Amino acid sequence: MRNLVIMPAMAQNRERMNLGEYAEEATIIVDEPVRPAKHFIEANTQEATLHHLKHECITPVFSKDNELTINHAAFVETIQDAAQSFFSGERVEQADIRVSHIIKGRIPEAIHKPANQLLESDKTIYYERAAFSIDVPTIYETVGGNKLNLSIVGVRAYNQMNLYSKKVPELFRLAIGFKNQVCCNMCIFTDGYKDDLRVSNTTELYRAALELFNNYNPAKHLHLMQQLGNTSMSEHQFAQIIGKMRLYQCLPTGYQKALPRMLLTDTQINSVAKAYINDENFGSFGSELNMWKFYNLLTGANKSSYIDSFLDRSLN
């Protein structure tokens, strides 16, 4: 009795059980870090949907004759239609819309309500500035190891118009170029940009968009960008360029007029210098920097521009 050992019933039967028939291959679950979405413009902007612009925002008018402006939603839809028509047979994606500078108001019935008692139905809003990007991903090329998709960008800023007058042709900016898929930087070329597009209705806007698309030469634009990779600068030369860019703003007006315009701000120039050291895609700290990477350092810094100056600086 002293040698008696009581064993669980499961232990006695363990050798007779074929556990393999119930076993499954182990699945290793790895949590992928969520990377923040990259946008073609970032500074002081928020994402907006076309539905929001169409159904939840009011349309500003010219105050002297109460004539409607072409609102942001109509602008986006018109260019979207023009792109789908011109690039028939290609895949044209829906617009990525960014807005800024919200203008708030109230309906007449809520004029005398305290602000803390306002209902959502009492409020009105519209956005002073809007920009959008429409990609055509089936038209693409690789430059410097980066995939570039054809992209159309539109910009509208009510602050650049006089809404206190009678209705006049309205100002729009429209560009077609390529978007770097690594960083969403926009690459704009002179032939693909209209900086002073003035129209009175969406029909004229549609026609102007088709004209811009037709005049743009993507092959020439791509060739010029590919050539950038054939030229490099040393770290010393990069430092000289950054220093001269910083000096530009301090030059007397006469000196500035004798030089090409330089629209980047001091803050953006500082961003270029930081990206030269830290950027995982285009940084070249301690080695030569080719002009394609330098160009992308500049376009990356431009993403911090406000909407109304974004395209001008992209071209510059």
Label each PLM-derived region with a short phrase.
Residues 1-80, 87-91, 98:
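Feature for intrinsically disordered/low-complexity regulatory segments and propeptides
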Residues 81, 85, 251-254:
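A generic structural signal for well-ordered alpha-helical segments enriched in polar/charged residues
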Residues 1-35, 113-316:
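Intrinsically disordered, low-complexity regions enriched in serine/threonine
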Residues 85-124, 129-131:
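A short acidic/basic microdomain associated with nuclease active sites
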